[in-house]
């Protein structure tokens, strides 16, 4: 059995996913129409106050929910729901509903919903793999907008530099295995994850004494430190910390336990 994690205590989701599931029946348009109804908002307010309502996970405060991306400018990235409600002089739930409507349901948030103690315990667990749970991004163009989760830039350097090297929760080989060989085995990718004859030449050259994430919640669009060269399918794509322009990556599909 395997589990996986990203080494952060904040999660990310669409803002509307915090609301009761019945609101989403019929799609986004139906959700937005319902949220404009004061009676529906009253029902939501009652529901989220119930013991056991778990859409909010372990969220203790509206200050633990901050805007990550607001495609239509409904709210400023980095501001918390508590901030927005105070500035608009309204109830926090009304602020949530108003932002969702103005952004047509596309607002994404960061949510402090996990414990750092749990993050550390899972990082040290031999059965836990590591992944970013996010898309490829860059600090320019359309993906350089807003304040997305720092895991998009820093997941792997953070595990190596912070949790393995600085905190000593696991060894360097253990940390690397979680994101390479062990992950490839779990996913059934037969020719990936190891430095061996017959394996695809996917290689990252880094300095173990300096590698670290630099992406933060307030300033997420930051590349990590300590990585000099990246090779994908035998082609150098990062050289001296700069992209070469090469795009040798390809889609990997699993068929059973053998990569086709």
Predicted region positions:
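Divalent metal-coordination and catalytic microenvironments
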Residues: 4, 89, 133, 175, ...
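C-terminal cap of metal-dependent C-N hydrolases
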Residues: 37, 120-127, 132-133, 137, ...
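Acidic, glycine-enriched loop/beta-strand segments at the rims
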Residues: 107-113, 119, 167-176, 184-221
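Short linear motifs in exposed loops
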Residues: 95, 240-241, 255
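Short, solvent-exposed cationic patches
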Residues: 252-260
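Alpha-helical structural signal
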Residues: 93-97, 180-183, 248
């Amino acid at each position: 059995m395997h589990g996986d994690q990203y080494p952060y205590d904040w999660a990310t989701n669409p803002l509307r996913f915090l609301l009761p599931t019945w609101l989403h029946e019929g799609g986004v348009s139906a959700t937005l129409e319902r949220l404009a109804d004061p009676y529906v908002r009253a029902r939501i307010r009652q529901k989220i106050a119930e013991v056991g309502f778990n859409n909010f996970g372990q969220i203790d405060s509206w200050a633990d929910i901050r805007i990550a991306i607001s495609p239509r400018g409904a709210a400023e990235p980095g501001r918390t729901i508590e901030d927005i409600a105070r500035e608009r002089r309204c109830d926090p739930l009304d602020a949530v509903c108003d932002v969702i409507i103005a952004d047509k349901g596309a607002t994404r948030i960061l949510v402090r919903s996990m414990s750092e103690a749990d993050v550390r315990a899972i990082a040290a667990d031999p059965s836990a793999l590591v992944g970013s749970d996010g898309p490829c991004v860059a600090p320019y163009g359309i993906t350089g907008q807003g304040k997305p989760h720092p895991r998009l830039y820093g997941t792997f350097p953070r595990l190596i530099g912070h949790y393995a090297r600085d905190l000593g929760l696991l060894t360097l080989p253990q940390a690397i295995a979680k994101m390479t060989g062990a992950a490839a085995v779990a996913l059934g990718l037969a020719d990936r994850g190891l430095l061996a004859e017959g394996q695809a030449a996917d290689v990252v050259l880094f300095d173990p004494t300096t590698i670290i994430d630099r992406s933060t919640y307030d300033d997420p669009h930051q590349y990590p430190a300590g990585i000099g060269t990246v090779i994908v399918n035998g082609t150098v794509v990062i050289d001296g910390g700069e992209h070469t322009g090469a795009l040798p990556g390809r889609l990997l599909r699993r068929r059973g336990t053998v990569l086709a």
